[in-house]
């Protein structure tokens, strides 16, 4: 093979499709289901990152700006090539002080401006009454109004599978439940392939490849240590927990973004397949397969949801229909 890709999540599947469509002979393996870890544990959004844009402006960070611009371009691409898995979603940002309305609108207007031709719809200001009409369960006390902007919503797991199948259609070979147990090297120490183990049968086989791509996300350090046992860790994993509530917690056609949670993060409240998704958290954690959502993180989400819903709406632990945790493969600060 020209390429052996380890990991069949969003990154691995994307690399496989890119390589296969360029005429390369590609093999891709994953020790679990395709997209079974981080890539299926998202907020179900394809977005440029409003909060990253805020950081770019406040910190004059050119790299953050470029990331937002690239993400907005990719958002439009997904909406164009896979309209059956993606769709525009208006998202309301409630404002509980009058001066926050122009502040939020300035940010979303810039977001639209950067998107340019890739924009899905123009942001607009809504009055207090219109905000409550759109989101009846929203806390009305001190509500001044709000701003609505547009982002994309996506079925992450099905998109991952679509990328894998598209890569296979263009000649790639893909196998799930197939684990890399060792990297094979030449006499000169160059990686020339890997030993694979079938997780179902235990059989092992050696695969030769001109290049090996480590696309294992938060698990990448384990693969790196197969090459260099003394390699220092480069991943600082963070847990992102989401919960789902019954569908009546949010309107069908609009999401909500709380830009100022108790600890300064943001939280989304989004309609999803007849239910409502709320999340996410951002907590340092250890790397482990199939992480379980912590009760403390679930309670944090419940508390934040209670903060921006009407006081006559009782949010109980028993309202949680499901919860999941995904690991963000954040890069360690080298300093």
Q: Which residues fall in each region the model found?
A:
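Conserved SAM/SAH-binding loop
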Residues: 177-181, 199-200
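Core beta-strand elements of the Rossmann-like FAD/NAD(P) dinucleotide-binding domain
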Residues: 1, 200-211
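N-terminal Rossmann-like FAD-binding beta1-loop-alpha1 element of flavoenzymes
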Residues: 2-28
């Amino acid at each position: 093979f020209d390429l052996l890709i380890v990991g069949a999540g969003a990154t691995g599947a994307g690399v496989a499709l890119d390589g296969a469509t360029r005429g390369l002979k590609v093999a891709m393996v994953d020790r679990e289901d395709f997209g079974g870890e981080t890539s299926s544990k998202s907020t179900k959004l394809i977005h440029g990152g409003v909060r990253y844009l805020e950081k770019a402006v406040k910190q004059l960070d050119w790299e953050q700006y470029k990331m937002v611009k690239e993400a907005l371009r990719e958002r439009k691409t997904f909406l164009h090539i896979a309209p059956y898995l993606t769709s525009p979603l208006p998202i309301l940002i409630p404002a509980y002080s009058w001066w926050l309305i122009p502040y939020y609108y300035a940010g979303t207007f810039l977001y639209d401006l950067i998107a340019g031709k890739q924009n899905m719809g123009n942001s607009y200001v809504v009055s207090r009454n219109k905000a409550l009409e759109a989101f009846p369960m929203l806390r009305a006390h001190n509500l001044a109004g709000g701003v609505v902007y547009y982002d994309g919503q996506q079925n992450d797991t099905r998109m991952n599978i679509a990328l894998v199948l598209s890569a296979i259609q263009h000649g790639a070979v893909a196998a799930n439940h197939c684990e890399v147990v060792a990297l094979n090297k030449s006499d000169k120490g160059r990686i020339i392939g890997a030993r694979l183990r079938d997780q179902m049968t235990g059989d092992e086989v050696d695969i030769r490849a001109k290049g090996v791509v480590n696309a294992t996300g938060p698990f990448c350090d384990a693969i790196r240590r197969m090459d260099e046992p003394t390699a220092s860790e480069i991943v600082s994993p963070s847990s992102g927990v989401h919960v789902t509530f019954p569908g009546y917690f949010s309107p069908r056609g609009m999401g909500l973004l709380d830009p100022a949670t108790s600890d300064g993060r943001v939280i989304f409240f989004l309609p999803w397949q007849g239910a409502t998704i709320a999340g996410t958290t951002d907590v340092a954690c250890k790397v482990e397969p199939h992480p379980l959502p912590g009760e403390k993180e679930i309670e944090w989400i419940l508390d934040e949801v209670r903060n921006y819903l009407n006081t006559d709406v009782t949010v109980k632990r028993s309202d949680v229909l499901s919860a999941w945790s995904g690991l963000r493969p954040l890069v360690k600060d080298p300093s």
